[in-house]
Amino acid sequence: GYRKVEWAEDHDLFLRMMRAGMRIGKVEKTVLSWRDSPGRLTRTHPAYAEEQVWRMKAHHLSLESRVSARGVAICGAGPIGKRLARMLKQEGVQVRGFFEVNPRRVGEKIGGVPVAGQGEFGKRWRNAVLLSAVGVEGGRERVRELAGAEGYTEGVDFWCCC
């Protein structure tokens, strides 16, 4: 059931259910008519703020055995990737590196973690779990393509985080 957490309790429940092996699906017929309003909790309560959503993602990722054992490599060294890396480190996850397409970022270190170029994708940090943190339009699909071509399996050793 629900528990007291700093983030959205319903999302937390769904993530715990999925980790426990439960499946979530869509019911084909309408069972509830939903009214949305500007005063809705998901738009006004601090537990639903973007920062808390990322904390929840980092927390639940840190509980994945592959993530805790192998660490992660993050696709995207922009604001989203940096935020995710910082929060994962706070959860005790080893961030092994970033992959980035911007040539100005390649070779830098972010929080002591190296940034590699696209040419090293699938070779460097290959044992780490791959996380996509690319927020630009089409970014998720592009990383998903590259990950699949390199033998990553989504939901096993690769996740899209945004």
What are these regions (language model features)?
Residues 56-66, 81, 87, 140-144:
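Rossmann-like AdoMet/SAM-dependent catalytic core
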Residues 17-18:
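Hydrophobic residues within well-ordered alpha-helices
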Residues 6-13:
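Acidic donor-binding loop at a coil-to-helix junction in glycosyltransferase catalytic cores
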